[in-house]
């Protein structure tokens, strides 16, 4: 009887501990949801000029169609590729760094220095977050 009591107490304690540590999977945000507004990011992405110095918009140099190169690589499937380029670097961090420091991760076959270099100074943090959120939807 004592053994049953001890097992019950341990089982109850484990159940409470697991409940306290775990979150509800249904509450997990969608990809990009915690980063920014993907709809606003798409709007910004498609504008021909962006930022305080009227820099070229993303769609000026990047296509959303697979294997279509305008100036830079296609962004079709970029969220998936971004998560696989560097071990230990999330897609979100890879994409953000690629906007803030374009020469940090130059895709094979493309030259460094081609991408506009000062988006980090010309776009607000919110605009960058929104662009990253949109890019994370491109799987």
Locations of regions flagged by a protein language model:
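Electrostatic cytochrome c docking/interface patches
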Residues: 22-52, 89
